[in-house]
Amino acid sequence: MLSNHYNIGVVEAGCDEAGRGCLAGSVYAAAVILPPDYANECLNDSKQLTEHKRILLRQEIERINILNASILAMHRALDQLKVRPEAIIVDGNRFKPYNDIPSTTIVKGDGKYLSIAAASILAKTYRDDYMMQLAEQYPQYDWQSNKGYPTRKHRDAIREFGISPYHRKSFNLLGDTQLSFDF
């Protein structure tokens, strides 16, 4: 059973993202505040934009790199909360300060805390829906199955058909060194 809160007695938001490790598609993030007495045995880790908006998001991801895009997406999700959290817990090991709210990163937090698990499920399911819509336009990449992740079939399709407008063209995987994919 997951823990209800990391910080007892404060309004806490759990944050997570989906899609950072993908070759295609946008990063989605969610922030969730749960009541102090919330319980749900089913809640656990989870492993309608216009085309123009999706392309703008892809360009933003490439410009600021995928990690920073993930953090920005989480900040934007926090901006949408109707209640201001007193603390933020984030799945993973990196997060940039959000306003003046204390934050804690928790590796595998989506398997430890309910609010992060809920945020993870929201981010993943919304992103999966988005990738299913794109799969209708680009069936050759098998996005209905791989959701943009770098499976063998997906990489083979890139080699055969080239990249789509939704593929990421670069990743910042090695610190300041930019790594470009040449398929």
Identify the function of each model-found stretch.
Residues M1-F183:
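RNase H-like, Mg2+-dependent phosphodiesterase core
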